Amino acid sequence: MPSCSTSTMPGMICKNPDLEFDSLQPCFYPDEDDFYFGGPDSTPPGEDIWKKFELLPTPPLSPSRGFAEHSSEPPSWVTEMLLENELWGSPAEEDAFGLGGLGGLTPNPVILQDCMWSGFSAREKLERAVSEKLQHGRGPPTAGSTAQSPGAGAASPAGRGHGGAAGAGRAGAALPAELAHPAAECVDPAVVFPFPVNKREPAPVPAAPASAPAAGPAVASGAGIAAPAGAPGVAPPRPGGRQTSGGDHKALSTSGEDTLSDSDDEDDEEEDEEEEIDVVTVEKRRSSSNTKAVTTFTITVRPKNAALGPGRAQSSELILKRCLPIHQQHNYAAPSPYVESEDAPPQKKIKSEASPRPLKSVIPPKAKSLSPRNSDSEDSERRRNHNILERQRRNDLRSSFLTLRDHVPELVKNEKAAKVVILKKATEYVHSLQAEEHQLLLEKEKLQARQQQLLKKIEHARTC
């Protein structure tokens, strides 16, 4: 490889022609041993160390492997390593890593991408760019245009092996060596991800007419394959469900786990959307005396196969009606004050117009048609009164305990006495008072008897 004689940093030799005009030479490439000289003129790259870490792009871009001959720039060392026969083309290494049969599975290496960066939009853009580049490189297509066939579902590695791994139609003699060689080096995403991504049943593949002059759609066992037009003939389908074209162009194929064709998406949408909503009616009613809103949804669900028969379509038609009353109630413990009484005023008018009745028969509907706001106010007043009475009862009980404590001589000066202590001491004090009362009553009886005796003596002394 030729080396450049000019370099911005002292003591640095550029061996890569791609990095000849770079202001700072990167230090993470294989020729990093000869970057610096040991002479006294060499300076350590301490001031540029942070700039060197910014040279490599993040995330690293995949090297362009397919069109090395059309590019005007000289190939980089990564491309040369990927295209090196001694490093990647040995059959011993392919057998050791299990990559020997990947050449038949991947006819075109341009479609294969890294698993981390793959996507439907990137695939479509890449296929479009490849087809345009092939048309510009090979010339205008002779007949037809690019066609896509409906995908035959997600194919597992076992299914691919059953369908014939060697059935990938490749015209190696018509393609350049630069395009045909990296196909054996690419890794099929199906090997990395053995499980299918889209689990769909295989759709029946229509047979290509034998009298078609243009190239028919190339059908892959994994997914939709974009085949560039211009092939003179179409080979008969192989047991693996794969057709190959005998012209100069390859079928741009992708694995079933990675991509889906547009026609397959349309078929899946038709299968998924078996039922569609025909009628959606939204009705909102508001009563004059009530702020409650009732929303009525009428949904008619009619299947797509209604054209099979009128009786079957009528039997399968389904009408769903649902009323959604919107209640705004903040107190969840109280009973719901919302009563369906919106139709009460019309009934009351009909009754009053049909046959006039006394006032007593009209009063009950009025009591039923009270607004929720009035009922809420009544409930709040009732709860407020209950709270006031309960608070008053607790205050009276506390004051009675304090009074009882003041009457017990042992607890007069004890302000922190508990209610249980107050009750016990008060009971003992009452028992002592009762005993004292009994003694006093006995003494009173004795005194009364003594008084009677003295009165009798006084009367006897007067009579004598």
Curated annotation (Swiss-Prot):
The record's GO CC annotations read: chromatin; nucleolus; nucleoplasm; nucleus
Q: Which GO terms describe its biological process?
A: astrocyte differentiation; autosome genomic imprinting; branching morphogenesis of an epithelial tube; cartilage condensation; embryonic digit morphogenesis; embryonic skeletal system morphogenesis; epithelial cell proliferation; lung development
Report biased composition (Acidic residues) as residue ranges.
259-278
Compositionally biased, Low complexity: which spans?
149-159, 208-233
Residue ranges of the region described as Interaction with AURKA: 19-47
Region feature Disordered, mapped onto this chain: 129-172, 196-294, 334-392
* Outcome of swapping residue 28 to A: Reduces interaction with AURKA
User: What does the UniProt record say this protein does?
Assistant: Positively regulates the transcription of MYCNOS in neuroblastoma cells.
**Identification of the protein by name:** N-myc proto-oncogene protein
- Source organism per UniProt: Homo sapiens (Human)
Q: Report the gene name.
A: MYCN
